[in-house]
């Protein structure tokens, strides 16, 4: 009788240990992250190449269903944008999303007497696409930007833009 109780208890403990070892890897990666865009080089109309100032903020990753997630980016500049994605092993495939991007750069124009520097402020509506690789406590995003000026018809393109998010 004691042997049967001991066997049942051992079997129950083994089942609990097995269920704990099969915990959901997606769930463990949900939550809050701090992000920073490290390299943000864009080209305007295939002529002007600009390295933008870095962007920092908070990223909230929530599970929607199964392996689908909702990502909310809250920039310290005040911008908030969201997208959905899908987790496939250690990779995130992002759905493209739209956001605005403000760009400031200086151009030199020839005047009658001397060159004159002119500061240009432009806003672009861009589509952001890409994916990410998940590591223990960090996520490395590789993003692409494509868009058009809000008040002009200039085109903006950015490739291999690196964003790193670290779990809080």
Positions of PLM-derived features:
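Edge beta-strand at a domain terminus
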Residues: 89-91, 138-168
């Amino acid at each position: 009788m004691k042997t049967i109780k001991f066997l049942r208890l051992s079997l129950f403990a083994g089942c609990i240990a097995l269920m704990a070892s099969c915990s959901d890897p997606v769930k463990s990666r949900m939550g809050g992250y701090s992000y920073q865009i490290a390299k943000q080089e864009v080209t305007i109309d295939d002529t002007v190449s600009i390295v933008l100032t870095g962007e920092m903020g908070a990223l909230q990753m929530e599970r929607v269903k199964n392996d689908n997630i909702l990502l909310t980016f809250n920039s310290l500049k005040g911008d908030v944008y969201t997208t959905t994605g899908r987790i496939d092993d250690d990779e995130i495939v992002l759905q493209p999303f739209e956001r605005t991007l403000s760009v400031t750069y200086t151009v030199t124009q020839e005047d009658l007497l001397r060159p004159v520097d002119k500061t240009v402020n432009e806003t672009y509506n861009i589509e952001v696409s890409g994916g990410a690789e998940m590591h223990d406590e960090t996520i490395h995003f590789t993003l692409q930007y494509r868009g058009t000026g809000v008040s002009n018809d200039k085109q903006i393109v950015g490739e291999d833009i690196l964003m790193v998010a670290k779990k809080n």
